[in-house]
Swiss-Prot record:
Family classification: Belongs to the NGF-beta family.
Listed name of the protein: Venom nerve growth factor
Role noted for this protein: Nerve growth factor is important for the development and maintenance of the sympathetic and sensory nervous systems. It stimulates division and differentiation of sympathetic and embryonic sensory neurons as well as basal forebrain cholinergic neurons in the brain. Its relevance in the snake venom is not clear. However, it has been shown to inhibit metalloproteinase-dependent proteolysis of platelet glycoprotein Ib alpha, suggesting a metalloproteinase inhibition to prevent metalloprotease autodigestion and/or protection against prey proteases.
Miscellaneous field: On the 2D-gel the determined MW of this protein is: 17.5 kDa.
Gene Ontology CC entries for this record: axon; dendrite; extracellular region; extracellular space; synaptic vesicle
Gene Ontology molecular function: any one: metalloendopeptidase inhibitor activity
PROSITE patterns: NGF_1, NGF_2
SS bonds (residue pairs): 139-204, 182-232, 192-234
Length: 244
């Protein structure tokens, strides 16, 4: 009888020792910790909700091709880049306002004010004044300021990105190019004006030259020589019927 009592007492003590002492020692995956899983799910749901709200307030980023030309205005140019500039051309101007054209379109004047990064430059396009005595140009040309040039061909023949707007000292400057083109390849029915059509073939064509402009190379601004239209000239060739 005593042996049976001892056996029951030992079984009771073993059962007490085998029971869990607290919920702190229970593994995270057990049903004893539903608060952790519920909290995690609640946080995940809240994060997804916040992400959806953020997408509604902030539009999706644009594609790379859409940012190719717009990103140039966001690049801040170091002022030292203009101090190191060489081979300045009177046909390239940085200004916050459209540059003026002279009344007779024979000269180009850059104003030396706070809105311009260029020095006071005046380029004469005529060596003598034009008198009203029937003087005409061989070819008719037109000169304009180009304010939206985005691409150009550099001196190596590669197509480069031209910076339209330049951010410098908390100001945005527009890069202008003074270009000259032919109005008409044939000012007269025979070709160029004043050419003997009996012995010569002639036509007017636009020629170009290289000027130093601010371009983009990766995410940095750099000076490069690019090609722009600068003149209208007459091309002549002797007629074949004169030979023989």
């Amino acid at each position: 009888m005593s042996m049976l009592c001892y056996t029951l007492i030992i079984a009771f003590l073993i059962g007490i020792w085998a029971a869990p002492k607290s919920e702190d020692n229970v593994s995270l995956g057990s049903p004893a910790t539903p608060d952790l899983s519920d909290t995690s799910c609640a946080k995940t749901h809240e994060a997804l909700k916040t992400s959806r709200n953020t997408d509604q307030h902030y539009p999706a980023p644009k594609k790379a091709e859409d940012q190719e030309f717009g990103s140039a205005a966001n690049i801040i140019v170091d002022p030292k880049l203009f101090q190191k500039r060489r081979f300045q051309s009177p046909r390239v101007l940085f200004s916050t306002q459209p540059p003026p054209l002279s009344r007779d379109e024979q000269s180009v004047e850059f104003l030396d004010n706070a809105d311009s990064l260029n020095r006071n430059i005046r380029a004469k396009r005529a060596t003598h004044p034009v008198h009203n005595r029937g003087e005409f140009s061989v070819c008719d040309s037109v000169s304009v300021w180009v304010a939206n040039k985005t691409t150009a061909t550099d001196i190596r023949g590669n197509v480069v990105t031209v910076m339209v707007d330049v951010k410098l000292n908390n100001n945005v400057y527009r890069q202008y190019f003074f270009e000259t083109k032919c109005k008409n390849p044939s000012p007269v029915s025979s070709g160029c004006r004043g050419i003997d059509a009996k012995h010569w073939n002639s036509y007017c064509t636009t020629t170009d030259t290289f000027v130093r402009a601010l371009t983009m190379e990766g995410n940095q601004a750099s000076w490069r020589f690019i090609r722009i239209d600068t003149a209208c000239v007459c091309v002549i060739s002797r007629k074949n019927d004169n030979f023989g």
